[in-house]
Amino acid sequence: MTTAKRPLALLILDGWGYRENTHNNAIFHANTPVLDRLNAQYPHSLISGSGLDVGLPDGQMGNSEVGHINLGSGRVVYQELTRISKAIADHEFEQNPALCDAVDSAIKAGGAVHIMGLLSAGGVHSHEEHIEAMCRMAVARGATKVYLHAFLDGRDTPPRSAKTSLSHFDDLFTTLGHGRIASIIGRYFAMDRDNRWDRVSQAYDLITQGKSKFQYDNAVTALEAAYERNENDEFVSSSAITDADGQVATLQDGDALIFMNFRADRARQITRSFINPDFDGFERAVVPKMHFVTLTEYAGDIKAPIAYPSENLVNTLGEVLQKQGRTQLRISETEKYAHVTFFFNGGKEEPFEGEDRILINSPKVATYDLQPEMSSAELTDKLVAAIESTKYDVIICNYPNGDMVGHTGNFDAAVKACEAVDACIGRVVDALAKVGGECIITADHGNAEQMTDETTGQAHTAHTSELVPFVFVGRNATIDEGGKLSDVAPTILTLIGEAIPAEMTGKPLIHIKE
């Protein structure tokens, strides 16, 4: 006969932040007697779920994917943009082995260093600060032939904003004494992801042959001509930029080509056209034998050196529980099921041994303001049954309502969503009390606490950077202030009497009074 468990439940209230301003604050205006009572009776604080505290740029609002990765891994997991920017600031970037090898191989072969990527300050697929650091590093290591192939943005930036970036890089190369912009083309062509190979081929031919619709002696001139043709940045036609002698710079055998996009989805196709031996998306007139490097990992089947490989998160909470022979349950609705499983487990799809999963279908409605309670009652039925079974040591549950209804911008519906979740929490807490269990109530990021944009007066449908609640319903305890999401996993391990692995850099926030 199995021993009855006294479960510890982690209840993640998605999109549930704390905001001092009560105006258009659905969480404040909701009738939440259960949470009000728990906050009055039990220790609680606020923790951070945004910005640098979760591995995002300073001030950047949190999101569900990042939030659950931090919650489950017990460490701040730097997202690619932040990770690379931090490496540049710490002067680690210039020593990156994959990048150094590429530059050095080109220099040794008497070749050129070609740098391509989305020249943008948008920070979604790339960042021009990363491209600048690469140009500086190449010249610092002795490269005299450095060529930038600029893909222009206009989607994650204003439609006609590339002039500032192009002018900056012209000035940069003048300052460095080496290098120049060799070509420009809109991301519509270079960064297609829908197998429209006729678009990608134009970028490939531009870089490998200098084959272009237009040719200019200056990148800004080329851009201005594109605007005259009524082409915004995203759609700029292939334009080769010549040097003082009227020559174009093309990718040759022995050269290096470094792709500076950090987001994978729109980087895969053009990468495959450069490196796949059996590529058949379009006919390649030339296939240079060069040293190709990707900034991050684009896909498992793309065989090229990677400057910043994906971090393999070991000893996440789920893995530690498995190693210690503990049982665990992950439960949520469809909308957040991946978050309490795949993302909480650090990007691992398969369940750990001893990990059960329950998926509750989210309601089939056009938008969730039409059913703000979503499937919370059914979810709670299953959760209460799991608690009463005394089968699990740790239960991870996500209530999606605050986030999914918050995204609709419907204030009244968001209030109802919060009230539905509050009622569910009451049932969960009662069930835990009957079996001697405990729970932590927190959130992954804010949303429903701000339903109107104070500046424009329009609906605020995005996440926020507000702090999120952290409540411990259990033994007599104190809670440290100033916590963040990555402190939650170490806290759980401490509460169930397990050691915190070295990989977890978060700190336990709850201290039981003996």
Swiss-Prot record:
Which InterPro entries does the record cross-reference, listed alphabetically?
Alkaline_phosphatase_core_sf, BPG-indep_PGM_N, Metalloenzyme, PGAM_B_sf, Pgm_bpd_ind
Which keywords accompany this UniProt record? Answer: Glycolysis, Isomerase, Manganese, Metal-binding
Query: What EC identifiers does the entry list?
Result: 5.4.2.12
Q: To which pathway does this protein belong?
A: Carbohydrate degradation; glycolysis; pyruvate from D-glyceraldehyde 3-phosphate: step 3/5
Residues the record lists as binding Mn(2+) 2? 14, 64, 444-445
Family recorded in the similarity comment: Belongs to the BPG-independent phosphoglycerate mutase family.
Protein name, UniProt field: 2,3-bisphosphoglycerate-independent phosphoglycerate mutase
